[in-house]
Amino acid sequence: MIDLSFLTEEEQEAIMKVLQRDAALKRAEEERVRHLPEKIKDDQQLKNMSGQWFYEAKAKRHRDKIHGADIIRASMRKKRPQIAAEQSKDRENGAKESWVNNVNKDAFLPPELAGVVEEPEEDAAPASPSSSVVNPASSVIDMSQENTRKPNVSPEKRKNPFNSSKLPEGHSSQQTKNEQSKNGRTGLFQTSKEDELSESKEKSTVADTSIQKLEKSKQTLPGLSNGSQIKAPIPKARKMIYKSTDLNKDDNQSFPRQRTDSLKARGAPRGILKRNSSSSSTDSETLRYNHNFEPKSKIVSPGLTIHERISEKEHSLEDNSSPNSLEPLKHVRFSAVKDELPQSPGLIHGREVGEFSVLESDRLKNGMEDAGDTEEFQSDPKPSQYRKPSLFHQSTSSPYVSKSETHQPMTSGSFPINGLHSHSEVLTARPQSMENSPTINEPKDKSSELTRLESVLPRSPADELSHCVEPEPSQVPGGSSRDRQQGSEEEPSPVLKTLERSAARKMPSKSLEDISSDSSNQAKVDNQPEELVRSAEDVSTVPTQPDNPFSHPDKLKRMSKSVPAFLQDESDDRETDTASESSYQLSRHKKSPSSLTNLSSSSGMTSLSSVSGSVMSVYSGDFGNLEVKGNIQFAIEYVESLKELHVFVAQCKDLAAADVKKQRSDPYVKAYLLPDKGKMGKKKTLVVKKTLNPVYNEILRYKIEKQILKTQKLNLSIWHRDTFKRNSFLGEVELDLETWDWDNKQNKQLRWYPLKRKTAPVALEAENRGEMKLALQYVPEPVPGKKLPTTGEVHIWVKECLDLPLLRGSHLNSFVKCTILPDTSRKSRQKTRAVGKTTNPIFNHTMVYDGFRPEDLMEACVELTVWDHYKLTNQFLGGLRIGFGTGKSYGTEVDWMDSTSEEVALWEKMVNSPNTWIEATLPLRMLLIAKISK
């Protein structure tokens, strides 16, 4: 059963209409299912079409077979019995010692006692006089719902002596409503008082106590005797203070016990299921707190988990007659589970994502709120403070929180700060989420922020977050922060939008010392990473650019300088060793992190900001500007018994210094058997650090037949291993094994070979690598009819490959990868499935890349590569590079813009014929494969 006592009659009627419509739909569905056996003879098909499979699966997963509509319908049918005031017999001093006297001089019902107070048992400890103060009107609602629900949830039935057995229930409920409508709370209480006195004289003492208590409350509320409708006080922010000074010792000891007994007697968790999806940003937040305290802690019983919190503006207390100033009710959840913490889904301003409103917020319009749903444990006069940075870092790594940590109430005009939770669940369940969740600040003044907050009150939580959260400009590093400061009236380019999303995503979490309680332009978003990405992407705060930032070579170079810090190895046989200088011919790479690489979009041109400075590969002809010098000492021998080629690498001397300042390098030797220049044929020695004369004394072994070996070439190259994997080429030696004299003993001895510069293997270009049949299409306006200019899409349809080479004998398991250059990020790369056991695989796979403007088509290039997947490695077979082949991209010379005439013709046809598939069959070739970045 659900406590629906807070619903108005209009709200109940609206819910009943929904329930009636649901019942009508169920009847229609049952009628359809009843006639199904006449039409369908197959039992399995009948099971699927009738929905029987769903209920069987549900029965296995959920024990509760009661539908939500049935629960609400049963709750709506319950009537309100007359008042029972036995909860006030032990509270003679409640009005004096209660915190209500210090707040707003009104009778108040704590949330944990609302609808739960029952007749105490004989063995129960006496309740504390100050533990609860009862609002007469709200007690009628809560007690009525609890008394009617007790036979369903309590282990034993309890009779309320104050419920009249002579008066019919319907008449009692109607009389209560009439009295309430005429005389407000006073009339309602008087009616219940008369019922008590006429019902039982034995309880006259309790009734007199209630009357005396009411008289005291009337003195504090001058407008109550006039029969006017008194508006409930607006709840203030909860203060979690663990030390009490104005409660006596006996009351303190009995208070947790009373709460425990009254709540455990219910037998089942209770939830107030009111949610407002269109609430403002100062709505109540769901605070989950679970901490074991001693009985003298005076806060929470050990057997309870109380989820509650309030965030509101203080100025709403001054003007509570305005509907706009009223804050939504605080929602309190009770759970009888002690050890298990409830799973916390992603929250947006305290709301569960996807949670819809059960009730409409009519109370905001009418200016009414129920004050019986709030309670504040406030005994310590010391003001609470936020945690210091040291405490914050300690709490993120420790599952417990210091008891001295409290919540700061919101000041006037303050902006709610989510995530400042002094509870253990968030810190234990999602420590990484708290540490990694960015702090996103508003770059606006307070007045404009408050004005904008008023305009987004009726929005949903998702929309509300997207309007209330904006990236902080100071968090965006590098040139993107400077570029954002330039304004324009043009549409922001997709590149800048991606820069903004990437910058917002890379912002580290700020310490709590940067968040002030009276600041109105800051908000800390504590939600799941995927939700944070979505909310950050919804923000459009990037000023428009008068020109394309990639049209300037200097700007493009500056952006690519910081990219190498994010490069990493990949197990797809894209060469891990690259030259110290890229095809952009940069003088030196920075080793600082960049916010321009970690992009989540799979579009090619949207994430152009991740322009990689590394387009080197094993087939590239540009290997940096380091001077190649020195010698290497090694020997080779073929062992017939093992059928292995042994390459004994002894040492090197007089190598070039990669670190010019310190005159040292970290060299290692890498060996290939050409033409198989992939990871399957690559062998490497260990890295000898900080020397120009490394000594290895290692043997590199190749398991290969001698007849096949005579068709190979041995390539030994020396590389400097950089900390950030930007490896520099130091020289190489190449031996033609076809002409090698294996019988000459001199060739088996260690010999010195001078190192030479790298030369591109032109002979490999002429080899037949197979063909690819594909089709391209450019869609300039994917969503027609929009007023604002939109970016286009490039569709790549990979149909099949023909006559692929066999590099592993008769085994082949091929697949195709696609990358839109200059974007080499992993997240923008797409690939087909692997098709094995054939040299003519049929893929029939379409890849879509968005974010293309007409001018981007002139600078971009589609790189399609075919790979042979074998165990944990992938071997390159061939590829295409479809573009205009100008050799430049956004004004910068690049070596990947090297399309052949056939590839250029296909790209030109696609650009000149939008919304049309252009088919072609192109020969695969060896490529200068661009290195993949993160």
UniProtKB/Swiss-Prot annotation:
Keyword Cell membrane: yes or no?
yes
Q: Which residue ranges have biased composition labelled Polar residues?
A: 161-191, 219-229, 392-415, 430-440
* Annotated protein name in UniProt: Synaptotagmin-like protein 2
- What job does the chain carry out? Isoform 1 acts as a RAB27A effector protein and plays a role in cytotoxic granule exocytosis in lymphocytes. It is required for cytotoxic granule docking at the immunologic synapse. Isoform 4 binds phosphatidylserine (PS) and phosphatidylinositol-4,5-bisphosphate (PIP2) and promotes the recruitment of glucagon-containing granules to the cell membrane in pancreatic alpha cells. Binding to PS is inhibited by Ca(2+) while binding to PIP2 is Ca(2+) insensitive.
Q: How is it modified after translation?
A: Isoform 1 is highly susceptible to proteolytic degradation and is stabilized by the interaction with RAB27A.
**Chain intervals for the UniProt region annotation (Disordered):** 69-300, 359-604
Which terms are listed as keywords in the entry? Answer: Cell membrane, Cytoplasm, Exocytosis, Membrane, Repeat
Q: Where is the composition biased (Low complexity)?
A: 125-139, 593-604
Per the record, its GO cellular-component terms are: cytoplasm; cytosol; exocytic vesicle; melanosome; membrane; plasma membrane
The segment(s) forming the C2 domain are 628-753, 768-897
Record GO terms (molecular function)? neurexin family protein binding; phosphatase binding; phosphatidylinositol-4,5-bisphosphate binding; phosphatidylserine binding; small GTPase binding
Q: In which tissues is it expressed?
A: Isoform 1 is expressed in hematopoietic lineages with a strong expression in CD4 and CD8 T-lymphocytes. It is also widely expressed in nonhematopoietic tissues. Isoform 5 is expressed only in nonhematopoietic tissues. Isoform 4 is expressed in pancreatic alpha cells.
Occurrences of domain RabBD (ranges): 1-57
Here the segments flagged for biased composition (Basic and acidic residues) are 192-205, 246-264, 285-297, 359-368, 442-452, 461-470
> What is the recorded phenotype of mutating E11A?
Abolishes interaction with RAB27A
